[in-house]
Amino acid sequence: IYTVAKMIPDLSSIPEVDGQLMAGDVLAELVHHPDRTTEEVIEEYLKDRRSDIPDKRVQEIIVQMRFIDSYATSFFREQAVRILVENGIRVTAYGTGWDQCEWSGSPYLDYRGKVLAPEILPSMNDAKIVLNTMTWFKAGAHDRIFNGMLAKAVVVTDDSTYLRREFTDGRELVMFRRQELGTLPERVFDLFGHLERAQEIADCGYAAARDGHTWKSRAEYLNCLLYTSPSPRD
């Protein structure tokens, strides 16, 4: 949250409504109903207040307000780490802003500062558990998930429709819903208390990522779409 503030545009460029008030209301709605998309909530907000705004202008405003995605993501990311730390689970965190959290002095937070993206993969190789919180899309996956699996760690992540379709909670990875963040410490403690089971999840996750979720497998999938699917002109 502390680094996202730099992304806020000039909200006075949205004369149709009070941009600052809209940003706060939309963010509050996303925090309370995290299954909703930013686009959906902004459109609903605008239509409720100004039914005369053309669809094209609604789309432009949605683009201007994209920073709300990052705020919502940052909120849940901080809450996920915080609830683990406050329950006595040691978390190693990388990136900016963690030292500005009011709870950053906890002995259970091992903050190692900002690192370049290529340095994260070797760190994953040393981890037993990789915690992921996704950006605000609802039907996809972040590459951290597959990188964590390929590092042979147990991946603990918030869910999406895609992840629920591709994997089974407790088999290839551990999934939680943002609305049930309070259960996260219990899920992690369960992994600590059943190390053989945790290793089975890590092994299944590695096999699943190796067999179907590498860059090579993605390239083959795209190649299949491009060269074997019927042409739109046919």
For each predicted feature, which ranges?
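Catalytic binding pocket for nucleotide-activated donors in carbohydrate/polymer assembly enzymes
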Residues: T96, W103-L226
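Nucleotide-sugar donor-binding catalytic core of glycosyltransferases
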Residues: I1-K138, H142, S160-L163
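Conserved small/polar residues in nucleotide/adenosyl-binding loops
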Residues: Y227-D234
